[in-house]
């Protein structure tokens, strides 16, 4: 796994298709463990189902890579993801930590991002409450 393959994996402009199951199986180990702030999935079938589920819940999705760092079998990819849902666009900046096995496939994939702020911030009434909570506990 090199930076060119990682950049391709983390690139999906609005209006273009997501990676196919075949493409994901070429990059991910059968026993891949995936975790993000909303879910944990074990195995390639569960990972593919999670990706398909996200695509079905959204009108469109984009993914844009930023900085990519690889050290031996660990890679970090900064990214920005946009989700369009019912006419509202949600933007999530984040980073992925990928562990690569000896066959060059991802065996562990963990995404780090703030789910609450970008999800509920744009929503009337809830957005104000979320911003109040952040100020109360973060500032």
What are these regions (language model features)?
Residues 56-62, 69-139:
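A beta-strand edge to alpha-helix "cap/lid" segment located at domain peripheries
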Residues 2-5, 46, 90:
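Soluble or luminal CAZymes and related metallo-dependent hydrolases
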Residues 14-17, 32, 36, 87:
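Flexible interhelical turns and helix-capping residues at alpha-helix boundaries
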Residues 10, 28, 51, 79-81:
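Hydrophobic alpha-helical core bundles mediating ligand binding, dimerization, or RNAP-core interactions
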Residues 21-25, 29-73:
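A solvent-exposed, acidic/Ser-Thr-rich amphipathic alpha-helical stretch
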Residues 12-13, 38-40, 83:
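Short histidine/acidic/glycine/proline-rich micro-motifs that form metal-
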Residues 1-27:
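Short acidic-aromatic low-complexity motifs
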């Amino acid at each position: 796994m090199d930076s060119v393959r990682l950049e391709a994996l983390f690139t999906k402009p609005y209006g273009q298709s997501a990676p196919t199951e075949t493409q994901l199986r070429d990059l991910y180990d059968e026993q891949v463990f995936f975790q993000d702030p909303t879910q944990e999935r074990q195995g390639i079938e569960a990972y593919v189902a999670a990706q398909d589920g996200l695509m079905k819940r959204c009108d469109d999705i984009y993914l844009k890579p930023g900085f990519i760092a690889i050290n031996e079998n660990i890679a970090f990819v900064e990214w920005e993801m946009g989700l369009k849902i019912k006419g509202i666009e949600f933007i999530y900046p984040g980073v992925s930590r990928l562990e690569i096995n000896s066959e060059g496939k991802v065996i562990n994939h963990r995404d780090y991002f703030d789910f609450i702020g970008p999800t509920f911030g744009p929503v009337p009434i809830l957005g104000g409450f979320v911003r109040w909570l952040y100020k109360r506990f973060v500032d």
